Design a protein with these regions (language model features):
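Hinge/lid segment of periplasmic solute-binding proteins
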Residues: 80-134, 157-160, 265-267
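Glycine-centered hinge/linker elements that transmit conformational signals in sensory
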Residues: 160-166, 199-231, 257
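Short, solvent-exposed loop/beta-turn-alpha elements that line the ligand-binding surface or hinge
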Residues: 98-108, 151-152, 194-213, 258-259, ...
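Extracytoplasmic/periplasmic substrate-binding proteins
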Residues: 188, 215-293, 419
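Extracytoplasmic/periplasmic solute-binding protein
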Residues: 116-129, 133, 157-202, 243
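Long, aromatic- and glycine/proline-rich binding clefts that accommodate carbohydrate-like moieties
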Residues: 315-373, 377, 405-421
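Extracytoplasmic "Venus flytrap"
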Residues: 20-37, 362-363
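Extracytoplasmic "Venus flytrap"/periplasmic binding protein-like
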Residues: 21-22, 39-108, 144-146, 244-245, ...
Length: 421
C-alpha cells in the first residue's frame, strides 16, 4: 500500500508540470463541488489548472514530501486557517507580501489579512473564501429596535433592549438561539460572546470580564424564547414566526431567506466591550516554496480572489466572498441578504475573528461540552457564576493539557498547551 502511494506521488509529480498549476486543496472535496470548481469556477483562468482536492493528511504529507525532496509540483495550496500551521512552523510557504500589495485594493477584511500572517511578520496565505454565523430578523421586529440603534452595528445591550421591547409589546419572548442538542450554541459562546466581552476564547475563560459576560447573558435570556433549548436550525422557528430574531450558521438560516426573502433582514452579530466577536470559517490560498512556477501560481491566486470569481464561487459552492463585491441581480435575493450580512460582519471596524478550536484531535467535542455545560449551569440552572466558571475552567484546562493544543485566535499564541488563566 505504501509503495502504491509512493508511485502515485511520483506519477503526480511527473504530471504536475504538464498540467499547468497544480492546485492542492482540502476544500471543495465532494464530487459535485470539485466538478463545479473544475468546470465552472476555474474555466475563466487563462492558464491550465489541475485541481486536486484531498483529505488533510494526504494534503499535508504531499507538501512535506515535496519539501523533503526539494522538487515540487504543487503550485497553489487551498486550506482552512487551521491547516497551515505545520507548514508555517517549518518555513515551507512562500511569503505573499508582494502579491498582497498588488491585490489589497480588492478590499480583503483587515481581520482576515492579519489571520493570514499566522503570527509571523509575513503574509503566509491570502484569504480565499469564508463561511460563518450571522443574525436574521423578521421585518415586524424592526419597529421595536431601540432608538438610535444601527442594525449593522448593534451592541449586546441593544439586542437585550430590542428583545425586551418586543416582549413588552407582544407578551412573547421572540429572540431565539439554537440551544437544542444538535444546535450550535457552543459556537456562539466560543466565537461571539466570549471574544466580544473578554477578547479571548480560552485564556480569559474564568476572568472577571467573563463573569460580567455571563451576568449579561443571563439577563438577556429573560427575553429568549424558552423553546430555544430544543431548537437546532433557527430557519424553522423564524419561518413559523415563533422567533423574530435569531443567531445561527448561514447554512441553518438559508431556507428562511431563500423561501421568503421579502420577510427577513440579515445583519452582523452584536459587539461587546472588546469588539464584534465572530467565528469565520476562513479558507486561504498559499504558495509552497517548492512551487515550480511561482508566477503562474500567483496568477491563479489573483484569479480566485477577483470579485467576479468570488461571486461565482458563492453561486456555485456556497462559500462567501472575502473581497469587496457588488451583489448582482442574478444572485437569489435570500442569498444576497446573507452575503451582505457576512461581508458587513467581517469588514466591520471592530471585527474580532475567533477561530474554531484547533489542535484538539478527537477531544473537540469535550471542549464544546465545557462551554455548553457552563451555559446550562449559569443561564438555565441559575448557579453561582464564579463557582460554575471555576469548575468548568478545570475541565477545560485538563483537556488542553491532555492534547497539548496551543492557543488559537483571538488568544495570544502560547508555547505548549493554551493556559486557562
Amino acid at each position: 500500500m505504501r509503495k502504491a502511494g509512493f508511485l502515485a506521488f511520483l506519477l503526480a509529480s511527473s504530471l504536475g508540470l504538464a498540467q499547468g498549476v497544480v492546485f492542492l486543496s482540502t476544500q471543495l472535496r465532494p464530487i459535485e463541488e470539485a466538478q463545479k470548481m473544475r468546470q465552472v469556477i476555474l474555466k475563466g483562468f487563462s492558464g491550465q489548472v489541475q485541481f486536486v482536492p484531498e483529505d488533510y493528511p494526504v494534503w499535508l504529507n504531499r507538501v512535506l514530501a515535496e519539501a523533503q525532496t526539494g522538487r515540487g509540483t504543487v503550485g497553489v495550496l487551498g486550506g482552512l486557517h487551521g491547516d497551515f500551521p505545520p507548514l508555517v512552523s517549518r518555513g515551507l510557504l512562500e511569503p505573499l507580501d508582494g502579491l498582497y500589495a498588488r491585490l489589497q485594493d480588492r478590499g480583503f477584511p483587515q481581520a482576515f489579512v492579519e489571520l493570514g500572517r499566522m503570527g509571523t511578520p509575513n503574509q503566509q496565505y491570502l484569504p480565499w473564501m469564508q463561511a460563518t454565523y450571522v443574525m436574521v430578523a423578521r421585518k415586524e421586529a424592526l419597529k421595536y429596535l431601540p432608538p438610535g440603534a444601527d442594525l449593522n452595528a448593534l451592541t449586546y445591550e441593544d439586542l437585550k433592549n430590542w428583545a425586551k421591547a418586543i416582549q413588552e409589546a407582544t407578551g412573547q419572548r421572540r429572540l431565539g438561539f439554537p440551544a437544542g442538542p444538535g444546535g450550535l450554541i457552543h459556537r456562539f459562546l466560543q466565537g461571539y460572546l466570549y471574544p466580544s466581552y473578554t477578547g479571548s476564547q480560552v485564556r480569559r475563560f474564568k476572568s472577571p470580564e467573563a463573569e460580567a459576560m455571563w451576568r449579561d447573558f443571563r439577563e438577556l435570556w429573560r427575553y429568549v424564547n424558552p423553546r430555544s433549548t430544543a431548537y437546532e436550525f433557527m430557519q424553522e422557528p423564524l419561518l413559523s414566526g415563533e422567533v423574530w430574531i435569531a443567531w445561527d450558521h448561514t447554512a441553518r438560516l438559508k431556507d428562511a431567506l431563500v423561501q421568503r426573502p421579502q420577510d427577513f433582514v440579515a445583519f452582523p452579530a452584536p459587539a461587546g466591550p472588546k469588539g464584534r466577536g465572530f467565528m469565520p470559517v476562513v479558507a486561504g490560498l498559499a504558495i509552497p516554496k517548492t512551487a515550480p512556477d511561482k508566477r503562474a501560481a500567483e496568477a491563479l491566486v489573483d484569479y480566485l480572489t477577483r470579485p467576479e470569481v468570488q461571486l461565482l464561487t458563492l453561486k456555485e459552492v456556497g462559500f462567501f466572498p472575502v473581497v469587496r463585491v457588488r451583489y448582482g441581480e442574478d444572485l437569489p435575493e435570500g442569498i444576497r441578504l446573507l452575503a451582505e450580512a457576512v461581508s458587513a460582519q467581517s469588514s466591520a471596524k471592530d471585527a474580532l475573528p475567533s477561530l474554531l478550536p484547533v489542535g484538539l484531535g478527537d477531544k473537540g467535542g469535550e471542549v464544546n461540552k465545557v462551554y455548553r455545560d457552563a451555559f446550562t449551569r449559569i443561564v438555565l440552572r441559575g448557579e453561582e457564576i464564579r463557582r460554575a466558571l471555576d469548575l468548568e475552567a478545570q475541565n477545560l484546562a485538563r483537556i488542553l493539557r491532555e492534547t497539548g493544543a496551543p492557543c488559537w485566535p483571538p488568544d495570544a499564541p502560547s508555547t505548549g498547551a493554551c493556559p486557562v488563566e
